[in-house]
Amino acid sequence: MQSSQISKTNSAQARSVKLSLAHSPDSDDAFMFYALATKKIKTGNLRFSHTLEDIESLNQKALEGVYDVTAISFHAYAYLADRYMLLPSGGSFGDGYGPLVVARGPLNAQSLKGKRIAVPGKLTTAYLAMRLYEPDFEPVFMSFDRILGRVASGDVDAGVLIHEGQLTYAREGVNKVVDLGEWWNRETQLPLPLGGNGIRRTLDRRIIQQTAKVLSESIRYGLDHREEALEYATEFARGLDPSTADRFVSLYVNDWTLDYGERGRRAVQTLLDRGFERGVLSKQVKVEFVE
């Protein structure tokens, strides 16, 4: 009897797998992870601990392999490909829209050369896209939530806005100079891939595949139960009213998020290929997804 109990305990411990999971405290990520965070879906033997940090902090920690599963910028993936694979769902794409370059004064897209431009981190896709658009500018790195204020005050010539700032910038009296997602679409006829979720390569293959399935189910649950998932996500929307939060989530949680598809995967590879060709990335990277 005692031996049987010990065996059952050991078996249960062997079956239970604890994984550290990190994502940003943004309404689109909150929407994606709603079902997982609130235990609306079954996770089998997987047990997740959730950590919320801004995307550039997550990029930097991914360089150290801190988390088992983490949200990352696709730009950052170029430096993480030896540690992480991309999960097949959870991607954020701007399909004809994306990070916005804004300025306080009468600045146009042709006059960004040499300007001091605030960007939300060296490993963000926003920075990579800005470098592809205009290679010759002076980057001023800062937290994404400070950029709009610094542009409005005139401390920098322009700024690249991500997250909700893309919808609220006009309130601060600044003007749109260029939409980098729109520009990218004209250049490539592809959506601009912004960020996805990476999983550590060193994990057991079955755990990797099971995690991919759980994340996909969490996103599907949110899309199928939009109202309750949106209510949860609005808690992370940094003061946005529900309708604006809804609009933001709609931009970045959609069919692309549930499944990259061939076109989405090609967009990620194209982004990193362009980065290498233009000298922004020091090496060419082959994107690898969990299958």
Can you say where each PLM-predicted feature lies in the sequence?
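Bilobed "Venus flytrap"/periplasmic-binding protein-like clamshell domains
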Residues: 14-38, 99-157, 164, 266-270
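Pocket-lining segment of extracytoplasmic ligand-binding domains
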Residues: 144-235
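Secondary-structure end/capping motifs
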Residues: 204-274
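A structural signal for short loop-to-beta-strand junctions that line the ligand-binding cleft
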Residues: 19-20, 83-91, 116
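A local structural motif
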Residues: 41-51, 133-146, 281-287
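Extracytoplasmic small-molecule ligand-binding "clamshell" domains
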Residues: 28-32, 41-73
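Hydrophobic/proline-rich hinge and linker segments of small-molecule sensing/allosteric domains
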Residues: 2, 86-109, 132, 185-202
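Beta->alpha turn/N-cap motifs
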Residues: 54-56, 65-78, 143-144, 161-167
